[in-house]
Amino acid sequence: MDVGYVCEWDKRPRTSHCPSIPLVCAWSCRNLIAFTTDQRNEEEKDITNLIHILDTEHPWDVYSINSGHQEVITSLEWDQSGSRLLSADADGRIKCWGMTDHLANSWQSLVGSEVDGDPIVALSWLHNGVKLALHVEKSGVSSFGEKFSRVKFSPSLTLFGGKPMEGWIAVTVSGLVTVSLLKPNGQVLTATESLCRLRCRVALADIAFTGGGNIVVATCDGSSTSPVQFYKVCVSVVSEKCKIDTEILPSLFMRCTTDPARKDKFPAVTHLKFLARDMSEQVLLCASNQCSSIAECWSLRKEGLPLNNIFQQLSPAVSDKQPMILKWRILSATNELERVSAVALPKLPISLTNTDIKVASETKFYPGLGLALAFHDGNVQIVHRLSLQPMAVLYGSSLRPSEEPSLKRQRSPTPCIHFKALQMSWTSLALVGLDTQGKLSMLRVSPSMGHSLDMSTSLRHLLFLLEYCMVTGYDWWDILLHVQPGMVHNLVEKLNEEYTRQNAALQQVLSTRILAMKASLCKLSQTTVTRVCDYHAKLFLISISCTLKSLLRPHVLNTPDKSPGDRLTEICNKFTDTDIDKVMINLKTEEFVLDMPTLQSLQQLIQWLGDFVLYLLASLPNQGSSVRPGHSFLRDGASLGTLREMMVMIRIWGLLKPSCLPVYTATSDTQDSMSLLFRLLTRLWLCCRDESHPCDPDESLIDECCLLPSQLLIPNMDWLPLGNGIISRLQSKLPLRLQFGKPPVAPSYASVQYEAYTRSPTQPKIDHLRRLHLGTFPTEPCKSCTRCGCVTMLKSPNKATAVKQWEQRWIKTCLCGGLWRKMPHTYS
C-alpha cells in the first residue's frame, strides 16, 4: 500500500478551520468522489456546507456545490449507476443530486425529503435487486457468465411487472426510520415510522438488505454497555401511500464488555458497519476509549434450540424436529489497537463463506478480502474482513511532505494528522482518505496485500478485475493504478483472448467497451501509445457505421427479416469486385434514398471516412513500422470491410447529392478518386478478410499506394487530444502533490510522447465527434471526456434529424464510455 497523490486546498487562514466537524466521503462505481470539508466560508454570514465532487483522473478539477444544508452534512451516498447522489444533514434534510446536462462537474438538486430537526445517522438507496457474485475459483473458465453470475435477489420494493422502485431509506438520531419513494411521474412518497415502540437515542446506525427484499437496520446508542439492536424493515405501497412495518431481530452485546478484565476499558462504540450492503448477516463493531480501540466481527447464524427433557416427553413430535433460532456469534476480535478514526469496507462482491474464503486464499486472490482501518496516529491498516488479521499497513509518516523536518514534527504539540473519512474503490484496489488538514489522499492498495506473487498471478488477478468491470460497466481507473508499462502488452492480448471466447451476442454487447479498455491500457506505455489512436478510430468507425446504416429504410414495408444495412454487408462480402460501380448495381438503390438536407448534414462524418481510407492506403508502404497510427487497421479485415461498405453507401448518396461526397485535392481534374481508393481498399481487404489465413499485400498494390501522395493530397488525421489526466504520471510510485483548482504542469516527456498524433495548443481546435473545426480560440462552450479527452461542443449547431440522432448517442457519455465534464473558459 502506497500513496498515489495528495490534493490540498489553497492555503486558508487558520480561523476558517473547524476541526470538530465530521467529514464524509463517497466513491461511485464511475470513479467520482463526493466529499465534504471542515472549512468555514468567512465571506458569507452563514456557514455554507459545501459538497465537493471530482473524478479521480482529474482531482484538481473539483466542483463545489453550495448544498443548501444549514447543518453539518452527515451522510453521502451514490446510487448503483453512479449518476445520482444523496446528501443528508444534522437537521433531518435529505437531498437527491443529479448531473446537469450529464456533466460530471455540474450538479443540481432534483428532489428531497425532510424529518424536521432530527439528525440523520444512516442513509442508503433502496436495493434494485441486482447482485453479482464473483467466483474467484472460476477465473480460468472461458465464459463470463460462469465467472460473474447473477444472484437471485429481490428489490426492496417493486412496481407493476417486477420493476424495482427507486427511493431511499434513512435512520434518525431519535430512532425513526424514514423512507422516500420516487414515482415514475416524479412525485415523492415519504413515510416515517419508529423502529420500535420504545424510542431511544441512536448514535450509530447502518443499513443492509436481504435477498427476500427486506431491509435490516442496526442501531446503537454509543455506549458499549448497551446492546446493538437489529430491526427488520418492510416497505410497501398501499392506496398510493408508503407504508413501513418494523420487527425486532436478535440483538448482541460486544464481547469486550462481557470480559471482566476489559469491562470498562472501552466505554464507547465508535463504529458500526455491516460488512456489505447486501449481507445483513455479518457486522463489524468497534469500541474505543481516548487512546485505543478494539474491533469485533459478528455473524448471525441459525442454531437449534435445545428443549428440556420434560417437553420432549410431553410432545414426542417436537423432539423429531428441533426448533431453530437466530443468534449472533462472534467470529473474531482484534487485540488492542491504536484509536480507530475511520473504517472503509470493500465493495467487491466476494462471498464470505468458509469455502469461498479458502478458495480465495488458495488462488492468492486478495482484493475484496480486506477492510481498511485508519488510526489517530496517522497509520492505515488493511485487515482481513472476517479474521481481522493484519494484511497490509501504510505508516502516517509516508503521507507527510518529505520536505518537512522530522525534528519539527516531533516538537509539534498538535495531534497527529489522521484520516477522518475513508472509502474504498469498487474493485478494492484503491483508498481515498480525508485528513484533519482537509487534504484528499489517494492510496494504492496492492492486489497482493503484502504477499509475494509472481508476475503471471498478478496479471491474472488484474485481468479478472478488468473482465469484472467490462461485464458490470464500472469504471476501471483504480485497476490502472497497478498496471506497469511492461504489463500492458500482455494484458491487452489476454483481454482480447478472453473476449473472443464469449458467444457472438455478448461480444457484440461488449465490443465498444473492450476497445475503450484497451485504449486506456495502451496509454500507460510509450511503446503502445499509437494503438490508442487506432482503438479510438475504430470506436468512431463502428459508431459512424451504425448511425449511417440506421438511416436506411426498406423500400417496401413487408420485406424479409434482413434490414438494408444487413443486405449491404452481405452484398459487399459476396461481390469482391474492385470496381465500386459493379458492386453498387447489386444493391436496391431506392433503399438508400434520403432527403437532400440530411445528406448534406452528414458531410463532415463522410469526409472523415474518406480521409481515413486515404490515410490508411497511403501508409501501407510503411506497414513495417508499428509506431505509426493506423498500423493495426492494415491487418483488420472486419474494419476494412466496414470501410468498404461505407464507400459503397457514400457513392450512392453522391449520385443524389454530389456535394455530400468527401472532398479530395487531386493533381488531375479527370481522376475518379473514390473509384481509385475503393479499388486499392478492396485489394487490401482481400488480403486479410480471412483472419485465420491472412496474406501479405502484393508488390503491385504497395507500388500503387506509393503513388498516392503524387495523385492526392494526404490529410493530417486528428487522432486524439493531448491527455492531461493523472494516471500515466502515477507509475513512478512517487506520490504527487496537487492543488485543487490548479492543473499540474504537464511533464516535458508527455508532449514528446504524443507530439506526432495531436494538435499543439496553438493549433486550431476541433470537435472530435462532429468533426467541425472550432478555430484557435473557440467561442462556443465545450465539454471533454474524463477518460479519453475527446472534445465536443456543449450545444448542437445543427437542426437536421440525422445529426441529432448522431449527437444523441453521446449525450450521456463519450463514445469510449467516459463521463463528460464542462471545459473551463481558458480552453477558449
From Swiss-Prot:
Q: Which controlled-vocabulary keywords does the entry list?
A: Activator, Nucleus, Repeat, Transcription, Transcription regulation, WD repeat
Q: Which SUPFAM superfamilies match?
A: WD40 repeat-like
Q: What cellular-component terms does GO give this entry?
A: mediator complex
Instruction: Give the primary localization class.
Output: nucleus
WD-type repeats, residues: 68-107, 199-241, 264-308, 622-663, 777-816
Localization of this protein: Nucleus
Q: How does it assemble?
A: Component of the Mediator complex.
Q: What function does the entry list?
A: Component of the Mediator complex, a coactivator involved in the regulated transcription of nearly all RNA polymerase II-dependent genes. Mediator functions as a bridge to convey information from gene-specific regulatory proteins to the basal RNA polymerase II transcription machinery. Mediator is recruited to promoters by direct interactions with regulatory proteins and serves as a scaffold for the assembly of a functional preinitiation complex with RNA polymerase II and the general transcription factors.
Task: Give the UniProt family note.
Answer: Belongs to the Mediator complex subunit 16 family.
What name does the UniProt record give this protein?
Mediator of RNA polymerase II transcription subunit 16
Q: Which gene encodes it?
A: med16
